[in-house]
Design a protein with these regions (language model features):
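C-terminal binding/interaction regions
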Residues: 2-6, 10-11, 89-146
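Short active-site oxyanion
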Residues: 2-3, 58-61, 80-82
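Conserved beta-strand termini and adjacent loop/short-helix elements that scaffold enzyme active sites
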Residues: 6, 32-34, 86
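Short, solvent-exposed amphipathic alpha-helices that sit
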Residues: 13-24
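A short beta-strand-loop structural module common to alpha/beta enzyme folds
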Residues: 28-39
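Short, structured active-site "lid" loops
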Residues: 45-63
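Mid-chain, well-packed structural core segment of small domains
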Residues: 63-64, 69-109
């Protein structure tokens, strides 16, 4: 499984930690930036990571900014993306089980390294349940055609 990563300056340090976490867990990743703590714009990097997932170049994505909110909104503007802002492991698990989220957004200003590490592992190992949830996901995805 290959993971797309993106962040802004507020998420840079946590993204560096997430890259090490992915390496330790044996996942391949592609880093779509940013590449320093210099001020930058989260839509650029959230969208780049989301495009890689939407185009099938990466299987899932993790994006990070200070709150996780802005970068998740940017990622969700890309057709085919279901990016969930997650603050804990239960949210990371349930968004995979019930929403088949293909991206997760993390708020670096509110999420410590230990929590982020556990969230990444849960997000990447939890399977979609399908069933009634598949019907709901299909309805969400149909909204993109409106």
């Amino acid at each position: 499984m290959k993971i797309a990563l993106g962040c802004d300056h507020g998420g840079y340090e946590l993204k560096q930690f997430v890259m090490k976490t992915l390496e330790n867990l044996g996942y391949e990743y592609e880093n779509f930036g940013c590449y320093s703590t210099e001020s930058c714009d989260y839509p650029d990097f959230g969208a780049a990571a989301a495009r890689a997932v939407a185009e099938g170049k990466c299987d899932r994505g993790i994006v990070i900014c200070t709150t996780g909110i802005g970068i998740s909104i940017a990622a969700n503007k890309i057709k085919g993306i279901r990016c969930a802002h997650c603050a804990d492991c239960l949210e990371a698990e349930m968004t995979r089980r019930h929403n088949d989220a293909n991206m997760m957004a993390i708020g670096a200003g509110f999420t410590g390294k230990n929590m982020a590490e556990r969230m990444v592992e849960v997000f990447l190992t939890t399977e979609f349940e399908g069933g009634r949830h598949e019907r709901r996901v299909n309805k969400m995805m149909a909204l993109e055609q409106e």
